[in-house]
Curated annotation (Swiss-Prot):
Disruption phenotype: No visible phenotype under normal growth conditions. Gene3D superfamilies: Nucleoside Triphosphate Pyrophosphohydrolase. Its cofactor is Mn(2+). Belongs to the Nudix hydrolase family. GO terms for biological process: diadenosine tetraphosphate catabolic process; nucleoside phosphate metabolic process. PROSITE patterns: NUDIX (PS51462), NUDIX_BOX (PS00893). This is Nudix hydrolase 25. The gene is NUDT25.
Length: 175
């Protein structure tokens, strides 16, 4: 992977939008009140686009979606000390943070929202609930250390996110 800064875990992020150009976010089970877009590590030998679609399916159950755009460069964020210690134990590395390749992905149609399943038949779901949010809400509700990255993602995809509709109510992972 070209232009990847050393010391940063290769990762992808997915800005999933619906037909109203609202953005999918989910609240983390381990960080109450923190909402985020789907993201995850790139596996050995995997290209970033494939990783993005795999992560989308793993975290949301969505398979009927298409990549619309991408952020041309890698975006990075540093882990706060407590998060860094935890993830380095978990991942078995010495990572300063994550380098992310971001993709804008659109549901193929509104019926595809029915696919969203945070548990996705896995016992270890990362999320408690999900919702469709306006772009500015995505940034406001992110954890502090991810906000600059989210701001850049929303800015880059801004032309696709204009004229957004109303945010939908939260959806429980257990529905």
């Amino acid at each position: 992977m070209e232009n990847l800064p050393p010391g940063y875990r290769p990762n992808v992020g997915v800005c999933l939008i619906n037909s109203d150009n609202l953005v999918f976010v989910a609240s983390r089970l381990n960080v109450p009140g923190a909402w985020q877009m789907p993201q995850g590590g790139i596996e050995d030998g995997e290209d970033p686009k494939s990783a993005a679609m795999r992560e989308l399916q793993e975290e949301t159950g969505v398979v009927s979606a298409e990549i619309v755009s991408e952020v041309p460069n890698w975006l990075t964020y540093d882990f706060p000390p407590a998060v860094k210690a935890k993830v380095n134990r978990l991942w078995g590395g010495e990572w300063h943070g994550q380098a992310q390749k971001w993709y804008l992905v659109r549901l193929r149609n509104d019926e595809d929202e029915k696919e969203i399943n945070l548990a996705n038949n896995e016992a270890d779901s990362e999320f408690a609930e999900w919702k469709w949010a306006k772009p500015e809400e995505v940034v406001e509700q992110a954890v502090d250390y991810k906000r600059p990255t989210y701001e850049e993602v929303i800015k880059t995809f801004g032309s696709f996110l204009n004229d957004t509709g109303r945010a939908a109510k939260c959806k429980s992972a257990k529905w």
